[in-house]
Every structure is written in structure tokens, then in C-alpha cells.
């Protein structure tokens, strides 16, 4: 093994391994909470700091942009100079960004500090999974990754709930102060985490780091800004052109490097490539579903941000219930069929949601969400374990970073592309419903979004306003349900990729270690690699 550890996996006590997992889970929780907690604070931030709509978007997107752009670099720094060391640096950077965001008095300052948080997260997130990979022997790794995945799902669900309650009861800055005690707990827990790194003295792949970081930032910028600027606008075409040029240059540099940051040979392995692609598509479908349901709950049904967050929780509960089963089932049926079961459950859940109407009962929504989340919990740990099993432990940080990049790109691309389709469908539907009923300028304003329609309706005579609200709500629901169908189609494509590229059974050495844990004294048959 080409990784040095203060304590190697087979020498680490079982109690200490699970303590390390708890600390890594706290780090993961911080990152995933921050992905969603700010959304509920945006209206209050807009009023207090006078932020425009585009600035509010960048308060959210600055975090995603920096996080996605620097993940590969963050993973590589941990591999080469110490995963524990760079995770601690990341926690401090994230804390500095959180304090700055809580204290800032300008919208521009808040955008900047969100970027600092993204930098910290890019150092923390790949370190958590790579440390787990190096601390846990293969026989326990699937279970540990299942718990790590469940905590990520919990963070996604807790963000809107905690954010809604804090904004309603304390104020928007409290969503950033929330991170400080969690960060303190993680930093104290790092005392128990052994150091690990690639024992080869490779140094930093500076050309690869620069090309990958700038290329990913250009790509994510194009994805984020595409819906607003227009996919064929010069700004977006330049961003995508830069992304293609820089990432192609990155591939060329890595292919020629004696010590590449991201060895391209990983992608020649069908299981690695298949798991990365499938994971991106799964997150694509997942975040789109949450994105539109949150708007439906708050704008169409008139619920508070806190209530909307609570109604998303069943998906997180489903993930928490499904993730621990993943490690058990993957040994019995293999990753391919487990991923197929995951996608099937998620497709079932999202198709059940296509029947949502304005007056749909809470139960008719949370049951499909629970099925959706349970499916995600079943399969996502198996996908992550497949990615990590395909890379040497010395490169665990970069393997973890690729896993995380696929998540971030999948989520950003899903919200941007399906969001564009849904906005277009909404605009067309509401225009057809209102043309000839209200002035054309009102139709134009209402067509911007269902949220704008609510504001416009309040300024109109009561009867006309009610007509506008009814048309806008129905147009949004019809468009949202179309978005759910597109999401289901994307999940079907994940099934095709999984069936084609994901192996029927785990890698031989991985399966052998799993079975040794179940029956240490028993003979271990060699599994099929088909």
C-alpha cells in the first residue's frame, strides 16, 4: 500500500475507526448543510442588504462555483501533503468564511465570503471520504461509506429546516453562525484522526492544478449562468469554449505527466467511469426534484420556509434508512443490480410526484419523496464504494474528488437545464392562459416566474389578481410535472449506463474482504467479475 498512516487500517482499533467516521461525518454534514441552508435566508438577505435578484443568485452560486472548481485540487493536496492536515486547513477556512458572512453588511461581501466557504469545503469534502477509505479495511468500508452517504442526505434535508427556523426566530446571519459549533466539534475530533498521504514524494502538479481549476470554474459558470444569459449568448459560449479548451489541455498534460494529479487510466476502468457517470445523473435528478418542490410548497401552497423544509425531510429519512442497507445488499446482489434497484425506486417516486396538484395532500407528496430518498440511499453508497475501490489508496483524495465533482456538476447541470425547460414551459402556459384577459405588460411580468406573479397579483384588483394567481399556479404545476418527467428520463439513462458499465459483482479483492468480515474463519470463494 502506498499510503502512510499514523495507524494503518488493520492496526486501528474498531472503536477508533468508528470515532474517525463520526468526525468525518461531522465535516460532511457542514458541507451539505451549507448547500441548502442559505436558500431559506435569501428573502431576508434581500431586504436587509438590498440585494438584487442576480446578486441573490450569486450568494448561492459562489459557493457551488468555488467548491466544484477546486475539488480536484483539494483532493490532490490531501493525497500529496497530508489529508488530515488539509482537512484541518479547510475547516478553519470554512469557519473564517462563515464568520465573515455572518458579519458582513454588504451583498457583495456576502458573495465573497460564500466563495471562501466554498474554498474550505473543497478541502474538507474529498478529505472526509479519502480518510474513511484509508482508515477502514475493505471489509468494513461499504458500511462506513453508507453511513457517510446517509449523513450527506441528512445535511441536504436539515439545511432548509434549520435555515427556516433560524431566519424566522433569530435572523439571516444565524444560518452562518450555525456552522461555528459544528466546526469546533469537528476540529476537536480531528485529534483522533490519523494522518495519511501518498508516501511517494510527488509534489504538486501545478500545470494540472491550474488547468483543472480554471476549466471546471469556466464549465460551472457556464452551467449556472446559462438559463439567465441564454445558452447561445456570447458570454456562455465563451465560458464553454474556455472550459473545453482548458479541460482538454488538462487531459493532455495529465497524459504526459510522470506524476499526474488525476491519472487518466482511472477512466479506462469501466466500473470507475460507469459509477462516476451514474452518480452525476442520480444527483441531477435528485436536486431538480427538491428544487421545484421547495418552490411549490412556499409559493403555490403558501407554506413557510420552515414548513417547506420539513416536507423535504422524508427524502432524507428515506436515505438514512436505505444507506445502511447498501453495504449488506451489495455483497449479496452486487453493485449493478443494487444501482438498478436504486434508480427504479427513484423513478417510481418521481413519477408519483407528477400527479401533484395545488390541493394535493401532504401524504400524497411525502410518500413518493420517502420512496425516492430510500432508493437514493440504497444505491449511492454502492456507487461511491465502486469509485473508491477502483483507485489505489494513495490516490484516495483524487478519487474522492472525482466522486464529489460528479455530484456538483450533476446538481448544477440538472437545476440549470431542467430549470430552463420548466421556465420556458411555465412562460408559454401562463401566457396562453392570460392573453386577452389582462394587459400584455402584465402577462410579460407574470411570465418571469410564479414568484413574480404573486407580487404582481397583489397590485391588481382583487378579481383580476385572483385570475392571475390561479393561472400562474396551474402553469407552474404543469411545468414542474413536465420537469419531473424529464428527471425520470434522466434516471432511466442512469439505468442504461449502470447496466452497461457497472459490474455485476464487486471487484474480487473487495468482495473477498467483505466476506472475511462476515465469516472470518470461513473459506472465501472468488466472486465472478462479470
Task: Give the location of each predicted region.
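Helix-loop-helix hairpins in multi-pass membrane proteins, especially solute transporters
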Residues: 71-208, 234-237, 317, 359, ...
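Transmembrane-helix exit segments and adjacent C-terminal regions of multi-pass membrane proteins
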Residues: 2-28, 32, 192, 271, ...
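C-terminal membrane-cytosol helix-exit motif in multi-pass small-molecule transporters
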Residues: 180-198, 215-224, 243-256, 497-502
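Transmembrane core module of solute transporters
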Residues: 17-67, 171, 178-179, 207-209, ...
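Interfacial helix-cap and linker-helix signal at transmembrane-aqueous boundaries
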Residues: 45-46, 77-78, 165-170, 223, ...
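Transmembrane alpha-helical cores of Major Facilitator Superfamily
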Residues: 29, 61, 65, 92, ...
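Transmembrane-helix signature of multi-pass solute transporters
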Residues: 93-100, 182-189, 245-249, 321, ...
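C-terminal module of multi-pass small-molecule transporters
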Residues: 82-91, 105-108, 127-128, 136-143, ...
Amino acid at each position: 500500500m502506498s499510503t502512510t498512516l499514523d495507524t494503518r487500517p488493520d492496526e486501528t482499533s474498531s472503536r477508533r475507526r468508528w470515532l474517525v467516521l463520526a468526525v468525518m461525518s461531522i465535516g460532511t454534514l457542514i458541507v451539505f448543510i451549507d448547500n441548502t441552508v442559505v436558500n431559506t435566508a435569501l428573502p431576508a438577505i434581500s431586504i436587509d442588504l438590498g440585494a438584487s435578484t442576480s446578486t441573490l443568485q450569486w450568494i448561492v452560486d459562489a459557493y457551488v462555483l468555488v467548491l466544484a472548481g477546486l475539488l480536484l485540487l483539494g483532493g490532490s493536496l490531501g493525497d500529496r501533503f497530508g489529508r488530515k492536515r488539509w482537512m484541518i486547513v479547510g475547516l478553519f477556512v470554512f469557519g473564517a468564511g462563515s464568520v465573515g458572512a455572518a458579519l458582513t453588511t454588504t451583498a457583495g461581501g456576502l458573495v465573497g465570503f460564500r466563495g471562501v466557504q466554498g474554498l474550505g469545503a473543497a478541502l474538507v469534502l474529498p478529505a472526509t471520504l479519502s480518510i474513511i477509505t484509508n482508515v477502514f479495511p475493505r471489509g468494513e468500508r461499504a458500511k462506513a461509506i453508507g453511513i457517510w452517504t446517509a449523513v450527506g442526505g441528512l445535511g441536504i434535508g436539515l439545511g432548509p429546516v434549520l435555515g427556516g427556523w433560524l431566519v424566522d426566530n433569530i435572523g439571516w446571519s444565524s444560518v452562518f453562525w450555525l456552522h461555528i459549533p459544528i466546526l469546533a466539534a469537528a476540529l476537536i475530533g480531528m485529534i483522533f484522526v490519523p494522518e495519511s498521504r501518498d508516501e511517494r514524494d510527488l509534489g504538486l502538479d501545478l500545470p494540472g492544478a491550474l488547468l483543472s481549476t480554471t476549466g471546471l470554474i469556466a464549465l460551472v459558470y457556464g452551467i449556472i449562468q446559462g438559463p439567465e444569459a441564454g445558452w447561445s449568448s456570447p458570454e456562455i459560449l465563451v465560458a464553454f469554449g474556455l472550459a473545453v479548451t482548458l479541460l482538454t489541455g488538462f487531459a493532455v498534460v495529465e497524459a504526459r505527466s510522470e506524476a499526474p494529479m488525476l491519472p487518466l487510466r482511472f477512466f479506462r476502468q469501466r466500473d470507475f467511469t460507469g459509477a462516476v457517470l451514474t452518480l452525476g445523473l442520480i444527483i441531477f435528478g435528485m436536486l431538480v426534484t427538491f428544487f421545484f418542490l421547495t418552490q411549490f410548497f412556499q409559493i403555490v401552497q403558501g407554506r413557510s420556509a420552515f414548513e417547506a423544509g420539513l416536507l423535504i425531510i422524508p427524502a432524507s429519512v428515506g436515505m438514512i434508512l436505505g444507506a445502511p442497507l447498501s453495504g449488506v445488499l451489495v455483497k449479496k446482489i452486487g453493485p449493478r443490480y443494487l444501482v438498478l434497484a436504486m434508480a427504479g425506486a427513484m423513478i417510481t417516486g418521481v413519477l408519483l410526484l407528477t400527479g401533484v396538484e395545488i390541493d394535493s395532500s401532504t401524504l400524497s407528496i411525502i410518500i413518493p419523496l420517502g420512496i425516492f430518498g430510500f432508493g437514493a440511499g440504497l444505491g449511492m453508497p454502492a456507487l461511491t464504494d465502486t469509485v473508491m475501490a477502483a483507485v489505489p489508496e494513495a490516490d484516495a483524495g483524487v478519487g474522492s474528488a472525482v466522486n464529489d465533482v460528479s455530484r456538483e456538476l450533476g446538481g448544477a447541470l440538472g437545476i440549470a437545464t431542467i430549470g430552463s425547460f420548466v421556465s420556458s414551459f411555465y412562460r408559454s402556459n401562463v401566457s396562453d392562459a392570460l392573453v386577452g384577459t389582462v394587459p400584455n405588460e402584465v402577462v410579460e411580468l407574470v411570465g418571469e416566474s410564479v414568484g413574480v406573479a404573486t407580487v404582481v397579483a397583489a397590485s391588481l384588483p382583487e378579481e383580476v389578481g385572483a385570475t392571475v394567481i390561479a393561472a400562474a399556479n396551474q402553469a407552474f404545476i404543469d411545468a414542474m410535472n413536465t420537469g419531473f418527467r424529464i428527471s425520470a428520463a434522466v434516471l432511466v439513462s442512469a439505468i442504461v449506463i449502470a447496466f452497461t458499465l457497472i459490474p455485476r459483482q464487486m471487484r474480487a479483492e473487495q468482495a473477498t474482504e467483505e466476506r472475511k468480515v462476515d465469516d472470518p474463519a470461513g473459506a472465501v470463494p472468488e466472486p465472478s467479475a462479470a
